[in-house]
């Protein structure tokens, strides 16, 4: 309400993760050294604020966000959220860990559990391997989620395929 003057978000389009959506609302995020405009707000609303940033974003904003699992905000960096009707400073900025969304049904088929770590092989023209953690959620759409720094480092694009090495559970 403080930022947009209303209780709910305006639905814009669905996200791949079941029940989640991009809203029409955008805001500016500000740190001590800079700001980033037109940051899309995702719904549905939760009972906490979270801003997922990359390390490159941290440099631009002048913040030191910790790497955390989504929703785990202990030690999150302070960030100012600026909407059309006001602004608020909240401890909400994190660098999200690399994670693989998966439904409970698919997790059972693959023999993996929530928070389990695996090796992911990336076979682009700039190949490599990374470690990622499973995030088992109801209606989870099977998808690897990386920040822009990781994706750009491997020249990955949305909807590219990667290989999960289930033999190399960590």
Residue ranges with predicted function:
Residues 86-87, 123-127, 167-170:
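Short, charged beta-turn/beta-strand-edge "cap" motif at the junction between a beta-strand
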Residues 1-32, 37-115, 121, 131-161:
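Short beta-strand-centered segments at strand-helix junctions
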